[in-house]
Amino acid sequence: MVNTAETSTSFSIASKVKDYFQLIKFTLSFTVVFSCVVCYLLAPNVIGFDWWMITVLFIAGMLVTGSANAINQAVEKDTDAMMKRTAKRPVASGRMSQAEAYAFAAIAGTVGVLMMGWFFRSSENGFNWNAALLSAFSLFLYAFIYTPLKKINSIAVLIGAFPGALPCLIGWVAATNMIDPFGTLLVNGREYLNVGGWVLFAIQFLWQFPHFWAIAWVAHGDYSRAGFKLLPADKGPTRFTAIQAVMYSVLMIPVGILPYYFGMSGQVSMFIVLAANLFMVVQSLRLYRSMDVKAARRVMFSSYIYLPIVLLALLADKA
C-alpha cells in the first residue's frame, strides 16, 4: 500500500526543486556559465582539463548568475504575471514569496562571489579579487540597473549587454588573476598579452544585440503588455531595429578575427568564426528585407547556435 504522506512529501520536494530551477532560469544560467568555463579554458596558463576546477567554476558561476536571475524575478513579479511566457514562474505565480527569492539570491550570490575569489586565488596574488569583484559587479549591474531600467528606456539593452558579456572576462580572469589587457602572462617561456579576456568579452557583447532584439521582436506583444521598452524604437519592431541588428552583426566580423590576430587560436577557428559571423549578417539582412516575425525568429535561433559554435571552435583550435 502506498504511503500517501511519503508520496506527498516527495512531490513537495520535487516541486520545490523545480521552482528553484525556474527561479535561477537554469537553461539561461547554464548558457552563461558555459561561456565562462570555455573562456577560462582559453586562457594560456590553463593547460589540460582539470575537472575539479571546472566543476568549482561551474557551481560558482551558477550561484552568481542564479542570484541575479532570482532578484530579477522577485523585482518583476507583477510584470511576469502579465506575460504568458513568464506567468508560471514561481514568484509570479505565487508559489514562492519575494522574501524567499531575495533570501536565496543573497546567499547564492555571496557564496558564488567568495568561491570565485577563494578557489581561483594564485600563489603570487592570493585571493582573486579581480574575479570576485567582476562577478559581484555583473550581478549588481544585471539585478539592480538593467532590471528596473527595462521599463524606462531601451538603453537597458546596452546596459544589459555588459553583465551578459562579463562571464567571458570573468572566466579568463579566474584563470589569470589579471584584468589589465596590456599585462603579460609568461607560460612555458612564452609571453602572452593578457588581452584575450577582453576580446572574448567583445565577441559576446556585440552578439547580444542581434540576439536580444530578435527575441524582443518575436515577443513584442508580451513585452508591451508588461511595459518593457526593449526595442530601439518605442513604436515597436521597425526598420531601425533591423538596421541595428545588421550593424552589430557586421561589427562582429572584424572582432571575430581578433582571437587569431592575438595568437589565441589558429586559422581553422578563424574561418569557422568568420563563416558564423557572415551567417548572422545574412540572417539580419533577411530581417531588414522582410520585416516580419518569421525572419526575426531566424535571427533568434541563429544567435542561439552562434555562440557555442564560435566558443567551441576557438577552444578546439587553441594556440
Predicted feature residues:
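Hydrophobic alpha-helical transmembrane segments in multi-pass integral membrane proteins
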Residues: L169-P181, M252-P259, Y306-A319
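Multi-pass membrane catalytic core of lipid/isoprenoid biosynthesis enzymes
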Residues: R85-A131, G236-Y260
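Cytosolic, membrane-interface loops and tails of multi-pass inner-membrane proteins
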Residues: V2-I13, V75-M96, W213-T241
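Functional transmembrane core segments of multi-pass inner-membrane proteins
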Residues: G48, A161-A216, H220-G221, R225, ...
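Interfacial loop-to-transmembrane junctions
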Residues: P237-F240, V281-I309
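Transmembrane alpha-helical segments that form the membrane-embedded catalytic/substrate-channel core
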Residues: L63-I71, F140-P148, F201-H220, I253, ...
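Membrane-embedded alpha-helical segments that form the functional core of polytopic membrane enzymes
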Residues: F34-L42, V46-K77, R85, G109-V113, ...
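Intramembrane alpha-helical segments
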Residues: Q98-M178
